[in-house]
């Protein structure tokens, strides 16, 4: 049966239960759905508070009954924490909680490490080892949260697109660290970043202090294409892929980049430029491939063929196979594409059911042949 649980905020939760479930079980289900620990839950039905050891049947709770959920604060209070941005966070606390605990709760909610938090109440900065009671902080008191930057500063990084990134840094951070922070935020590899301040390009080994970069300074980020060029790769489907390359990259590297972007294994790639197939060991420069050149990508099927698999719903699946593939391999490829377990697949060709241990060649299955897929229901044969 289903029952409903209504909270003080007016939200209604639906639970699947049995009459024999005890109240403890019901609280565990509420915890699963809402994350509220059982010891903070009070459940009320027909004006009565329900006891953990009793069952729903004991209280004559039937399908589609509505329980009311009231939160029991263990130490009995809520407090508020206001940030400099004006956001207010609500915390459930006890008078005996120390300031360290409170900072940990703020970290849980907001992700701000405790060592970057300063909490202020009644104009005083609160010390970690003291408790809320020590400072006479009572229910619904408001604390103020100020961020302590360890080295004490924020700087800005402006990109060529006009976007501004804010970073938390210390004067002692070196430029390499700053580039790593930019990579964390924006995903740009450090070796593609050039940082400019006051007209100077910043060197990795130097620190922000070395360049007299102070709080709220703005750096400019310019992207460095390592070898300095972009090329395009056009597929037979008409899709164009953009790659960042260097003239000294060999064709093998280029195929690896295509694999990273598109997932196509290098041994299935043939690259064509100016009518010539490019060889793995040669470089882009060898072929006079320059910035914004377009290569053409043709897929090489290793065993050299495509076959089709038609399902009872009329859907046709295309598979890349080799004549030497056995039927088991083919079923595994169908599983990869369609999620159908091999043991539920029966494959038919030319009126014959294909056996797992045999190969496509055994059945004279050639390129562009069509197999038929019939589902075998596990209970059947």
From Swiss-Prot:
Q: Which Gene3D superfamilies match?
A: Phosphatidylinositol 3-kinase Catalytic Subunit, Chain A, domain 1 (3.10.20.90)
Q: In Gene Ontology terms, what is a biological process of this protein? A: protein ubiquitination
Provide the species name.
Dictyostelium discoideum
* Positions of the pro-segment in this chain: 381
Task: Spell out the InterPro entries in the cross-references.
Answer: Ubiquitin-like_dom (IPR000626), Ubiquitin-like_domsf (IPR029071), Ubiquitin_CS (IPR019954), Ubiquitin_dom (IPR019956), Ubiquitin_ubiquitin-like (IPR050158)
Give cross-link positions for Glycyl lysine isopeptide (Gly-Lys) (interchain with K-? in acceptor proteins). Answer: 76
Q: What does this protein do?
A: Ubiquitin exists either covalently attached to another protein, or free (unanchored). When covalently bound, it is conjugated to target proteins via an isopeptide bond either as a monomer (monoubiquitin), a polymer linked via different Lys residues of the ubiquitin (polyubiquitin chains) or a linear polymer linked via the initiator Met of the ubiquitin (linear polyubiquitin chains). Polyubiquitin chains, when attached to a target protein, have different functions depending on the Lys residue of the ubiquitin that is linked: Lys-48-linked is involved in protein degradation via the proteasome.
Query: Where's it found, cell-wise?
Result: Cytoplasm; Nucleus
Q: What else is known?
A: Ubiquitin is synthesized as a polyubiquitin precursor with exact head to tail repeats. Some ubiquitin genes contain a single copy of ubiquitin fused to a ribosomal protein. In D.discoideum there are 9 genes: ubqA: 5 copies of Ub and a final Asn; ubqB: 1 copy of Ub and ribosomal protein eL40; ubqC: 1 copy of Ub and ribosomal protein eS31; ubqD: 3 copies of Ub and a final Leu; ubqF: 7 copies of Ub and a final Asn; ubqG: 5 copies of Ub and a final Leu; ubqH: 5 copies of Ub and a final Asn; ubqI: 4 copies of Ub and a final Asn; ubqJ: 4 copies of Ub and a final Asn. For the sake of clarity sequence features are annotated only for the first chain, and are not repeated for each of the following chains.
Query: What name does UniProt use for this protein?
Result: Polyubiquitin-H
């Amino acid at each position: 049966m289903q029952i409903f649980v209504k909270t003080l905020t007016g939200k209604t939760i639906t639970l699947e239960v049995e009459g024999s479930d005890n109240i403890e079980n019901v609280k565990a289900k509420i915890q699963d759905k809402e994350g509220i620990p059982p010891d903070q839950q009070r459940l009320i039905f027909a004006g009565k508070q329900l006891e953990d050891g009793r069952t729903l049947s004991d209280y004559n709770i039937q399908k589609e009954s509505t329980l009311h959920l009231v939160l029991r604060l263990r130490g009995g209070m809520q407090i508020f924490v206001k940030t400099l941005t004006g956001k207010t966070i609500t915390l459930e606390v006890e008078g005996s909680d120390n300031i360290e605990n409170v900072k940990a709760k703020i970290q849980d909610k907001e992700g701000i490490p405790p060592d970057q938090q300063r909490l202020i109440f009644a104009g005083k900065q609160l010390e970690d080892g003291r408790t809320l009671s020590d400072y006479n902080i009572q229910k619904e008191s408001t604390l103020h949260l100020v961020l302590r930057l360890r080295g004490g500063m924020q700087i800005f990084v402006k990109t060529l697109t006009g976007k501004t990134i804010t970073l938390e840094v210390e004067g002692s951070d070196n430029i390499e660290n700053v580039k790593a922070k930019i990579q964390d935020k924006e995903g740009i590899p450090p070796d593609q970043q050039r940082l400019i301040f006051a007209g100077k390009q910043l060197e990795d080994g130097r620190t922000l202090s070395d360049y007299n970069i102070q709080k709220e300074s703005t750096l400019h980020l310019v992207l460095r294409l390592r070898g300095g060029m972009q090329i395009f790769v056009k597929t037979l489907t008409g899709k164009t892929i953009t790659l960042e390359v260097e003239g000294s990259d060999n064709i093998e590297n280029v195929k690896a980049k295509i694999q990273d972007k598109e997932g196509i294994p290098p041994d299935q790639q043939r690259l064509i430029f100016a009518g010539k197939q490019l060889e793995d060991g040669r470089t882009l420069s060898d072929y006079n491939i320059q910035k914004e050149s377009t290569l053409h990508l043709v897929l090489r099927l290793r065993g050299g063929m495509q076959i089709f698999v038609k399902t009872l719903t009329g859907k046709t699946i295309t598979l890349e196979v080799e004549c030497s593939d056995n039927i088991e391999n083919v079923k595994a490829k169908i599983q990869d594409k369609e999620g159908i377990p091999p043991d539920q697949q029966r494959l038919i060709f030319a009126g014959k059911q294909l056996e797992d241990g045999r190969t496509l060649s055994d059945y004279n299955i050639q390129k562009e042949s069509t197999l038929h897929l019939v589902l075998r229901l596990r209970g059947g044969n």
